[in-house]
Amino acid sequence: MASTAMHSEPSAAAVPRHLAIIMDGNGRWAQRRRRPRVIGHRAGARAVNRTIDFCLDKGVSALTLFAFSSENWGRPQDEVDALMKLFLHALDRGVEELQRRGVQVRFIGDRSRFTAPLRDRMAGAERITAANTRLVLSIAASYGGRQDIAMAARALAVEVAAGRLQPEQIDEALLASRVALADLPAPDLFIRTGGDTRISNFLLWQLAYTELWFTETLWPEFDAGVLQQALDDYAGRERRFGLTSAQIAEKATEASSA
């Protein structure tokens, strides 16, 4: 759950390089105000902008947002249509500002289900911002973690069938090179808003050693204060990657004396 501890500023080492977020709670936020769910999604878009601002300010180098899962296509059609319109509007209006601020935009997921105009806007946003280096913003849209792993396995199977790869050459590193976000460091910190405590088929491979942080805060209410709580909690955690605390301490001592 969300930590209530607050510090003025985490050290540079405590700032995650890569932050991954499930943005949950737009619909409930709107329902509590007796408004249509699409109003919640619009409010959620403003929370995205606040989160980008925070990452740029703190020096986070990669931000991955779960915008629309492969399972979300099963939602009521009017909600899906409204989300697609909002997505298209955001691409039309927001890319220039992201370009100005040095944000590189990427999309991961199955684009084939989107309309041609939306696919064109997605490709255009990636092309326009490709050279930016301040922050890599990856939008997971029509994405599923199992689907991601299956596609990576399929790509390796094609190489085996073509004789370019032997089955015994396939290992974790090779599979990791085929999943989404392969060129980025694995997420250091995962955040889910809205109170649920599960990862919902998001980045299943990539989150293997990621620190998980959950908050009751609904996504439209997510702001720098809540993000700072997450970073404060993250700063106090010991990331062992399968080692013991003593081994981690020994490595830290060796690094400081080198």
From Swiss-Prot:
<feature type="binding site">
    <location>
        <begin position="198"/>
        <end position="200"/>
    </location>
    <ligand>
        <name>substrate</name>
    </ligand>
</feature>
<dbReference type="InterPro" id="IPR036424">
    <property type="entry name" value="UPP_synth-like_sf"/>
</dbReference>
<keyword id="KW-0133">Cell shape</keyword>
<feature type="binding site">
    <location>
        <position position="41"/>
    </location>
    <ligand>
        <name>substrate</name>
    </ligand>
</feature>
<keyword id="KW-0961">Cell wall biogenesis/degradation</keyword>
<feature type="binding site">
    <location>
        <position position="24"/>
    </location>
    <ligand>
        <name>Mg(2+)</name>
    </ligand>
</feature>
<comment type="subunit">
    <text>Homodimer.</text>
</comment>
<dbReference type="GO" id="GO:0016094">
    <property type="term" value="P:polyprenol biosynthetic process"/>
</dbReference>
<keyword id="KW-0808">Transferase</keyword>
<protein>
    <recommendedName>
        <fullName>Ditrans,polycis-undecaprenyl-diphosphate synthase ((2E,6E)-farnesyl-diphosphate specific)</fullName>
        <ecNumber>2.5.1.31</ecNumber>
    </recommendedName>
</protein>
<keyword id="KW-0479">Metal-binding</keyword>
<dbReference type="Pfam" id="PF01255">
    <property type="entry name" value="Prenyltransf"/>
</dbReference>
<feature type="binding site">
    <location>
        <position position="192"/>
    </location>
    <ligand>
        <name>substrate</name>
    </ligand>
</feature>
<feature type="binding site">
    <location>
        <position position="29"/>
    </location>
    <ligand>
        <name>substrate</name>
    </ligand>
</feature>
<keyword id="KW-0573">Peptidoglycan synthesis</keyword>
<feature type="binding site">
    <location>
        <position position="211"/>
    </location>
    <ligand>
        <name>Mg(2+)</name>
    </ligand>
</feature>
<feature type="active site">
    <location>
        <position position="24"/>
    </location>
</feature>
<feature type="binding site">
    <location>
        <position position="73"/>
    </location>
    <ligand>
        <name>substrate</name>
    </ligand>
</feature>
<feature type="active site" description="Proton acceptor">
    <location>
        <position position="72"/>
    </location>
</feature>
<dbReference type="GO" id="GO:0008834">
    <property type="term" value="F:ditrans,polycis-undecaprenyl-diphosphate synthase [(2E,6E)-farnesyl-diphosphate specific] activity"/>
</dbReference>
<comment type="function">
    <text>Catalyzes the sequential condensation of isopentenyl diphosphate (IPP) with (2E,6E)-farnesyl diphosphate (E,E-FPP) to yield (2Z,6Z,10Z,14Z,18Z,22Z,26Z,30Z,34E,38E)-undecaprenyl diphosphate (di-trans,octa-cis-UPP). UPP is the precursor of glycosyl carrier lipid in the biosynthesis of bacterial cell wall polysaccharide components such as peptidoglycan and lipopolysaccharide.</text>
</comment>
<feature type="binding site">
    <location>
        <begin position="69"/>
        <end position="71"/>
    </location>
    <ligand>
        <name>substrate</name>
    </ligand>
</feature>
<feature type="binding site">
    <location>
        <position position="37"/>
    </location>
    <ligand>
        <name>substrate</name>
    </ligand>
</feature>
<dbReference type="InterPro" id="IPR001441">
    <property type="entry name" value="UPP_synth-like"/>
</dbReference>
<comment type="similarity">
    <text>Belongs to the UPP synthase family.</text>
</comment>
<dbReference type="GO" id="GO:0071555">
    <property type="term" value="P:cell wall organization"/>
</dbReference>
<dbReference type="GO" id="GO:0005829">
    <property type="term" value="C:cytosol"/>
</dbReference>
<dbReference type="GO" id="GO:0008360">
    <property type="term" value="P:regulation of cell shape"/>
</dbReference>
<feature type="binding site">
    <location>
        <position position="75"/>
    </location>
    <ligand>
        <name>substrate</name>
    </ligand>
</feature>
<dbReference type="GO" id="GO:0000287">
    <property type="term" value="F:magnesium ion binding"/>
</dbReference>
<feature type="binding site">
    <location>
        <begin position="25"/>
        <end position="28"/>
    </location>
    <ligand>
        <name>substrate</name>
    </ligand>
</feature>
<keyword id="KW-0460">Magnesium</keyword>
<dbReference type="GO" id="GO:0009252">
    <property type="term" value="P:peptidoglycan biosynthetic process"/>
</dbReference>
<dbReference type="InterPro" id="IPR018520">
    <property type="entry name" value="UPP_synth-like_CS"/>
</dbReference>
